[in-house]
Curated annotation (Swiss-Prot):
Thermoactivity: Optimum temperature is 50 degrees Celsius.
Claim: NAD is one of the keywords in the record: yes
Assigned EC number: 1.1.1.345
Reaction(s) the record says it catalyses: a (2R)-2-hydroxycarboxylate + NAD(+) = a 2-oxocarboxylate + NADH + H(+); (2R)-hydroxy-4-methylpentanoate + NAD(+) = 4-methyl-2-oxopentanoate + NADH + H(+); (R)-3-phenyllactate + NAD(+) = 3-phenylpyruvate + NADH + H(+)
pH note: Optimum pH is 5.5-7.0 for the reduction of 4-methyl-2-oxopentanoate. Optimum pH is 8.0-9.0 for the oxidation of (R)-2-hydroxy-4-methylpentanoate.
Name of the molecule in the record: D-2-hydroxyacid dehydrogenase (NAD+)
Organism of provenance: Lacticaseibacillus paracasei (Lactobacillus paracasei)
Regulation: Completely inhibited In the presence of 0.1 mM Hg(2+). No influence on the activity could be detected with Mg(2+) and Ca(2+) and only very weak effects with Cd(2+), Co(2+) and Mn(2+). Reducing agents and thiol group reagents do not affect catalytic activity.
InterPro entries linked: D-isomer_2_OHA_DH_cat_dom, D-isomer_DH_CS, D-isomer_DH_CS1, D-isomer_DH_NAD-bd, NAD(P)-bd_dom_sf
Amino acid sequence: MKIIAYGARVDEIQYFKQWAKDTGNTLEYHTEFLDENTVEWAKGFDGINSLQTTPYAAGVFEKMHAYGIKFLTIRNVGTDNIDMTAMKQYGIRLSNVPAYSPAAIAEFALTDTLYLLRNMGKVQAQLQAGDYEKAGTFIGKELGQQTVGVMGTGHIGQVAIKLFKGFGAKVIAYDPYPMKGDHPDFDYVSLEDLFKQSDVIDLHVPGIEQNTHIINEAAFNLMKPGAIVINTARPNLIDTQAMLSNLKSGKLAGVGIDTYEYETEDLLNLAKHGSFKDPLWDELLGMPNVVLSPHIAYYTETAVHNMVYFSLQHLVDFLTKGETSTEVTGPAK
């Protein structure tokens, strides 16, 4: 069978080549993203594999339908950048990789948390300014003395809970669809109580429409003074302007943001112009109690291997069996 892959990163290429060798399938890969123009390269292929944070527009699915291509598999989890209505209209079926490496993202959230609890941004800022003495004045907090509120107890949230619990933290959690059975490492609470009780709030919820700005001014008002918020989940979860206001007022002690609210716009400008101007990003970047990263929490060798191999196997399942266990019919985490 013939498969075409889009958004290929340098680190993925070795796995694309190895997969093609292992399976004997024809695999053509491109670094460009899948859009209304590049989709034309897929004519004559059996299925499409892709990875991107930029939108999958309706025109992509229209042309897939015209070419007789019925299946798209993505190498990530989230589908909030996919026009699901158009996808269904043109009869395209979709699969994602719901759990390529939960540990990668959970460990990253823990890393940001420890960095902020020990005021390392402030320490580094003073060292870079040449003030060694002042750099030693920022007293930290121990994770084992904190209450950590984990929002979302799916694959990633469960690993995060174990990590935080391993440091001795008290862990509480919120999920509209709670796990059944015993869960000795944490207690479920309401979302309001999670905001009120947590010293650290760690987000692992999907980017579906009803979760847009789930962390907003009202949520910040409920939080403890000196709370820390970590988002390695999806870009739309936090009202960034409200977050900035609470950082400036001192209500928030710090934030760790790997999935920035306006990352899609910035990436589109970066691709088009070679750079982007985002005053809000620049302001956050200059704050020592803010840890920003470019959507890399998932980015480990294990995760990249699994993203490639799992997603391509899902495409093979679609093409040979007409189904796959990870088919997505609605918004996915």
